[in-house]
Regions:
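A secondary-structure capping/hinge motif
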Residues: 205-209, 254-263
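Alpha-helical bundle regulatory/interaction domains
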Residues: 1-173, 177-186, 192-196, 209-210, ...
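Residue-level "edge-of-site" marker
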Residues: 202, 217, 252, 268
Length: 289
């Protein structure tokens, strides 16, 4: 069922925008089950803060001083369950760029050296849990120019890695996405032939979150994706499809993660669908295998 993970494409707060400061490149087919995209760009003078929403992803981010040819900041940002803003570093008189790998929440563990327990809403140095990958990336990123070249190199590094795959973790991800976060924890665990307590330990170690949190985030993102794609245009249909108690419950949950009222998005859902059909999501540049 790896195709379910390949088809799962979480959206950011600005799914219709591609700029010099932020562009996305999809990974090759072999990595799509674990990685959402590679992203980055040039940070311009006076760049405004970037709005962040929960996308059920974790990011390995490098900020590079192109003028001096060195990495000035690197971080691993765990899965987030809150909306907020991110400020990009700038150096007067220097050109600064960003390069990042956006892992699916259920995919980062495969390239990590250590468990991801405690990384929810976390911000730490990549060497803490991704030492091998961090060293390999630091060796070449500053000397490479442009997002495409850095993506090609990072992808070659990731493909050469001995991933620590866990079949039960992969099956858990398939089940979660198949139900789009609407199954109860006991139903989810039963489908995996384990107890709810075992599921909680499994996800805590490999995803850095509880089953309840994972379900809530996937349900929110699945709802947001359908609205943005224009495939869900009625709030009452959304209540029934995603198992909310009523419209008020849906609105509260959406505002909790998105920081805005969902009604505005439903009003523009048909227009959103046409926009995405015409432009795509950050019109991605597919990486050749």
């Amino acid at each position: 069922m790896i195709n379910i993970r390949r088809m799962w494409q979480p959206l950011t707060a600005t799914p219709f925008l591609a700029t010099a400061a932020h562009h996305e490149i999809l990974p090759c087919k072999s990595l799509q089950g674990w990685i959402r995209c590679f992203w980055g760009g040039i940070v311009g003078a006076g760049a405004s803060p970037t709005r962040i929403i929960p996308d059920v992803c974790a990011d390995l981010i490098y900020h590079i001083d192109e003028t001096a040819g060195r990495i000035i900041q690197a971080s691993f940002c765990g899965v987030s369950d809150v909306c907020g803003t991110a400020h990009l570093p700038m150096i007067p008189g220097h050109t600064v760029s960003t390069f990042a790998i956006r892992f699916h929440a259920f995919g980062a563990y495969a390239f990590a050296d250590d468990a991801l327990r405690g990384t929810l809403n976390g911000f730490e140095s990549p060497e803490v849990r991704f030492g091998r990958l961090d060293r390999a990336l630091r060796a070449r990123l500053p000397e490479l120019r442009g997002l495409s070249a850095r993506t090609a190199y990072a992808q070659s590094v990731l493909l050469a890695f001995q991933c620590r795959e866990n079949p039960l973790v992969e099956t858990a991800a398939d089940a979660l996405l198949c139900h789009r976060g609407t199954a109860t924890i006991s139903e989810w665990a039963h489908e995996l032939f384990i107890s709810s307590r075992q599921l909680e330990r499994l996800l805590g170690e490999y995803w850095g979150m509880t089953p309840k949190k994972g379900s809530a985030l996937v349900r929110y993102q699945a709802l947001y994706q359908e609205i943005c794609h224009g495939t869900l245009t009625d709030v009452h249909d959304a209540v029934a499809r995603y198992g909310f108690a009523d419209q008020a419950h849906l609105c509260r949950e959406f505002r909790r993660y998105h920081g805005e009222n969902v009604s505005r998005f439903f009003k523009t859902s048909c227009e959103n669908g046409r926009t995405m059909e015409e432009n795509g999501v950050y019109p991605p540049e597919e990486v050749s295998t």
